[in-house]
Amino acid sequence: MVITDHGECVEAVEPVIISASRSTDIPAWYSEWFFNRLRKGYCVWKNVFNRKSTYVSFRRCRAVVFWTKNPEPIMPYLHELDERGIHYYFQITLNDYVAEGFEPNVPSVEHRVEVFKRLSEKIGRERVIWRFDPLIVTPDLTPRMLLERIRNVGNMLKGYTDKLVFSFVDVAAYKKVRENLVKETSCFTKETVCSAEMTEAQRKELVEGLAALRDEWKMQGWRLTLATCGEEADLENYGIEHNRCIDGELMKRVFADDEDFVYYLETGELPEHKGQLDLFGAKHRSAKQWKDKGQRKACGCMQSKDIGMYDTCRHFCVYCYANKDRDLVRRNAAKHSPNSDGLIE
């Protein structure tokens, strides 16, 4: 139960792990709102498909996973999470599609690298995960050229992260992605838009190149783990893992001093009185039991509650599945208030 801003007592879900967010960039655009809601103790999440609202309580929250292309606006607020004993880490997408204009509202590559480094120095490189995601080709952007861009960004990030996560763009599966790639770029037509997805030969070239880059960096003293996000292909022969973006194993390792949270990650119970639960021999849960059933089959994420909303991210990335069109995003942005209980009033 939570008491709303209007004094009503309502039912609320009480997640232990919050995802902020797969659906929009909360750190970049809605940091003030997020911390206002944290202070209030709850937020409202609206299901865009059935328009139903869910109240989300922060009472039991022990960890937040942030997804962003620009963490700079949220950095001045992070001390509030530390003071509340709420753990956090970041998934930071740092691509270089400047020449193609695929990400029109993100800062320059150089500025994003500088912010990435500052955040890594502030909270530790194991809590700042680099994503080059998704991987897209065009008639003028080949896998070899993509690899060179990844090398350039990686050389700037060397030693500031432990992991690189990547995926291949999904175009055929998303009508709105196809429409936006045609409408908002000069790279594709309706007839050619699906060529943004790599062929098997192109994927092989890219994967082999990434593995070679990793080995090159390892020789230079940078041990970087490679992992795919939401990809069914088994790349174990290349030493490439299936990623868990909401990652219980990472959290157990990085936040090991929080015994109650580690206990939750192993058993699914966040004990108010741990000794009482131990009397019943709480069993460890497998990764399969922990899987977030609301995500794609190939997704390895554990259970969490996402509090974002589609059609609210103003980066306007042309490949994004979370935005239908820019006009809708602008209309939604006009309805946002940092003082409301939901992202959109």
What does each model-identified segment do?
Residues H111-V177, G209-G230:
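Conserved C-terminal portion of the radical SAM core fold
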Residues E100, T138-D140, K163-C194, C229-N243:
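Flexible glycine/acidic-rich beta-alpha junction loops that bind and position SAM and/or redox cofactors
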Residues E231-I246, H315-C320, K324-E345:
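C-terminal/domain-terminus segments
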Residues V98-V106, P134-R144, T189-A201:
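Surface-exposed cleft-lining segments at the edges of enzyme active sites
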Residues S23-D25, K69, T93-Y97, D133-L135, ...:
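Active-site beta-loop-alpha junctions enriched in small/polar residues
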Residues K297-K324:
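Local cysteine-cluster metal-coordination motifs and their immediate loop/turn environment
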Residues M1-E103, V109-R125, K324-E345:
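Conserved Radical SAM active-site core
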Residues E197-K297:
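A C-terminal junction/extension of Radical SAM enzymes
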